[in-house]
Structures are given as structure tokens and as C-alpha cells.
Amino acid sequence: MLGKEEEQQYGQNGKGMENELPFMKRPWFKKAYENAIEFHEKDELLDARDRLELSKAYRSIAKAEMWGGWLGFSAVFLTPFAYRYYKTKAIKGVKVPRNFVLGVMALFFATNFAGRSMYTRQLNERDPTGVLKDNYSNKYGDNDFGAFQHDQTKEIPRNQRQYNMMRLLDSGSPSRWSMYFYITYQNPERRLPDPKVKLQQMKKGGVFNGSPFMNQRDPIGLYRNKGRKSPDPIEGEQNDSPVLSSWEKIRNGDNSSSSSWENIRNTSRDQSQESDASVDHESDIFISGFSDDGNATDNSSSDDKYQRLLQSGRYGGNRS
């Protein structure tokens, strides 16, 4: 139910914009608007620790639904096979389609039962005496949210804040709420926006962009370095030269316009020329090595002849 001041304000705003926003008079919109305000009031009271604990609580509910559902399916689907094998040592004769349909039905019932059981367990952990259950009220506007300040989070016990939020959300979509509370625990700015502000923006004709959590490019935080502007490859150095057609490139002798086969032939020709050059270089080295050896032998033979002439001259002089 709306407070008196909020009812008057809501009525005045609605009357002023009846022609522009006719859907605001419908019951489904009023109900959704009330639920959004109630959620926003309770969400503003949560601190980082509350969000982390609520994320763990709803994650445990999601796990309970998963394991409970598959255990129920396995129990109904596999029991006839086990019984048949125990009696006849074979699994022939079991009606598989019937077992599968019954297993799917058991999957849904077991999922709901396991999730509800874990949800009740999480509530009892936050309200072991049952006092919060007796004093719980799901009517928004009771705590004068317009005068809300952050210091009021200390006045409400932690278990009561978490209990009120879980009673409001119930046990539906536990995976989504677990992700929401964990992401807002890491970054509080990604909380759902104030529905009153969004309603005023819609009335003024502004564009409704949705919440920073549900309507964005990266809701789960997969991308890093948010806010950094990526360089635009188009804004780089621009080539002012005119664009030439293929025939103009051929006339100008542009090699870049050659076909792929011509590029392959050119590369193979270059490789063959390089291999021939390397072979010539090796042969030059080989020949130069032999020439050096020949010069060395020639020099050694001339030295021997010179020594022999000297010795013969000495001996001839002595004899004379």
C-alpha cells in the first residue's frame, strides 16, 4: 500500500501525464512499481557483508535445487532398472519412455522441494527464535525512506536486514540473485536504480536505459579495464593519395597489383638466385683454397732449389 504523501504525489504525477503514459494506470504497473520501491528500500540498507552472505545463501539454494532435482530424477528413472536386474539379472522389459516421463516430473517436484527446504533453512539461521517472522512486514514506506541516511544501517540488526530481503525475494531464481548480490558486493554502483527516479525520467520523456546491472554490455564483469577508450583504427593516419583502379596500377607499374601466382614465381626465382649465389661462393672458396696450396708448394720448391745452388757453390769453392 502507498503512503499518503506518496499516493498524493503518485496521483498528481499520473494525472499530469495521463495522455503520455496511459499504462501507468494499469494494475500490473502499479504492482510492479510497488515491488520495485520495496526492493530498493531494502537493498539500500544492505552493506558489503550482507550482500556477500546473501550471495552465499542463494548460491546454496541453487545448488540444493540442482542436486535435489537430479537425485529425484535418478531415483524414479533408475529404480525400475535396478529392480528388474535384481529379479531377472537383466534390464530387458523396462518401459523407458514411461520411466523418463516420470523422472522428469520427479525432477520438477524434487527441485522445488529441495530449494524450498534450503530457503527455509537459511531463514531459520537468521531468525532462530522466530521473532523476525512475527514482526515481519512487507509494506514499504513504514520507515520513512525519504529521510533515510546511511547511519540507519547500524540501527537495524544484520540478521533482520538479510531476513527481510530474503522474505521479499522468496526462493525464486536463486542463481540470478546470487550473482546480483555478489556483483554488487564487489561494485555497489551496479545496484538496481531508484524506481522513483526512473519513473520521473519516463514522465519527462527521457530514455529509459534500465539498470546498470541488467542492461549493459558486460553484466557479469568479463571484460577488464572498463572506461578505457579503445583506439579507433579508422582515426589513425589517413592516406590522402587517391584510390587507383586495377588498370591504373598496371599502367603505373605497381607491383602490388600482381596476382598470387606472380608473387609465388617471384619468390621462387629469388630463392633459386640466392641458392646459386651460395654455390658460387662455396666454389670460389674451394678454388681459392687449392690455389693457396699450389702457391705454397711452388714457393717451397723454389726454396729447395736455392738451397741446393748454395750448397753446390760452397762445395765447388772448397775443391778449387
UniProtKB/Swiss-Prot annotation:
<comment type="similarity">
    <text>Belongs to the PUP1 family.</text>
</comment>
<keyword id="KW-0597">Phosphoprotein</keyword>
<keyword id="KW-0812">Transmembrane</keyword>
<keyword id="KW-0472">Membrane</keyword>
<feature type="compositionally biased region" description="Polar residues">
    <location>
        <begin position="253"/>
        <end position="266"/>
    </location>
</feature>
<dbReference type="GO" id="GO:0031966">
    <property type="term" value="C:mitochondrial membrane"/>
</dbReference>
<feature type="transmembrane region" description="Helical">
    <location>
        <begin position="100"/>
        <end position="119"/>
    </location>
</feature>
<feature type="transmembrane region" description="Helical">
    <location>
        <begin position="66"/>
        <end position="85"/>
    </location>
</feature>
<feature type="compositionally biased region" description="Basic and acidic residues">
    <location>
        <begin position="267"/>
        <end position="284"/>
    </location>
</feature>
<feature type="modified residue" description="Phosphoserine">
    <location>
        <position position="230"/>
    </location>
</feature>
<protein>
    <recommendedName>
        <fullName>PUP1 protein homolog</fullName>
    </recommendedName>
</protein>
<dbReference type="Pfam" id="PF07954">
    <property type="entry name" value="DUF1689"/>
</dbReference>
<keyword id="KW-0496">Mitochondrion</keyword>
<keyword id="KW-1133">Transmembrane helix</keyword>
<dbReference type="GO" id="GO:0005739">
    <property type="term" value="C:mitochondrion"/>
</dbReference>
<feature type="region of interest" description="Disordered">
    <location>
        <begin position="205"/>
        <end position="320"/>
    </location>
</feature>
<dbReference type="InterPro" id="IPR012470">
    <property type="entry name" value="Pup1-like"/>
</dbReference>
